[in-house]
Regions:
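Conserved, mostly hydrophobic/aromatic
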Residues: 25, 33, 80, 115, ...
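Catalytic cores of alpha/beta
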Residues: 59, 63-88, 170-207
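Conserved beta-strand positions in the central sheet of alpha/beta enzyme cores
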Residues: 34-37, 66, 89-90, 114, ...
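Conserved anion-binding
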Residues: 1-11, 78-81, 85-161
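N-terminal beta-alpha supersecondary unit
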Residues: 1-46
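Active-site-adjacent loop and "lid" segments of alpha/beta metabolic enzymes
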Residues: 4, 10, 121-135, 163-165, ...
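Active-site-adjacent beta->alpha loops and helix N-cap segments on the catalytic face
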Residues: 40-57, 71-78, 92-114, 160-176, ...
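Short, acidic/polar
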Residues: 14-26, 73-78, 133-144, 194
Length: 227
């Protein structure tokens, strides 16, 4: 399922069998899966760990699974790893309490903890994208969280998400300018978009709607990156 611009009232369902979808993407060359528990993002606690477990089991060592949504306690993070996630993605909890990021990094290692910065009008927002975190401009949030040991940030331009209008390269360049590792999300709709993200220095990109609707073929992306 995908949302447009983080709006839960503008959701599109692409199927009822995420495990089958994951197997298909692995066959096409996927090496990682970004699994967001939208129910968990709204409720504040994981609701789809069984799905994470099923996907991780299905793809085995052919691809990693990173899990986000509702991971707002040490117990929730531990449960995500126990379900088979290789990495966790933290959002609202670390915007509200940056020390939570430090605790996660110290417990699990920086390589297994990514922080999602969902950006609207230059502000990092939380609570399933429904609220603005006071005083959390993107640059300020990165500075604080980097001080907590976070090394990788997943940056989503909410106004681009699910609309296939191309990534917000200006936003991404500004984050890359901090010297942190950046995974881009939002608006990625073509092979050229992926190559542009690689060329500005992003370490990864999250592909969604364009893949599900067939406008972008994963095999084409893999071939382009291997050239």
């Amino acid at each position: 399922m995908r949302l447009e611009q983080g709006d839960f009232s503008r959701e599109t369902r692409f199927g009822d069998d995420p495990v089958s979808v994951a197997r298909g993407f692995v066959a096409a060359g996927a090496t990682g899966f970004h699994v967001v528990d939208l129910d968990g993002a709204r409720s504040g606690e994981p609701r789809q760990l069984a799905t994470v477990r099923a996907i991780a089991s299905a793809v085995g060592d052919r691809a990693y699974v990173e899990s986000g949504g509702g991971l707002r306690s040490p117990e929730a993070i531990a449960a995500a790893f126990a379900a088979g996630a290789s990495r966790v993605v933290l959002g609202t909890a670390v915007l509200q309490d940056p020390s939570f990021a430090r605790q996660a990094v110290e417990t699990h290692g920086a390589a297994r903890v990514t922080v999602a910065l969902d950006v609207r009008d230059g502000q990092a927002v939380g609570e399933g994208w429904r609220e603005r975190a006071p005083g959390r401009e993107v640059s300020g949030a990165i500075e604080i969280l980097a001080g907590m040991g976070v090394k990788t940030f997943e940056v989503t331009a909410i106004d681009r998400d699910g609309l296939r209008g191309g990534p917000d390269l200006r936003l991404l360049r500004s984050v890359l300018g901090t010297g942190r590792s950046v995974i881009a999300s939002g608006g990625v709709a073509s092979v050229d978009d992926v190559l542009a993200l690689r060329d500005i220095g992003c370490v990864g990109a999250i592909l969604g709607r364009a893949l599900y609707e067939g406008d972008l073929l994963l095999a084409d992306v893999v071939r382009a990156l291997e050239r």
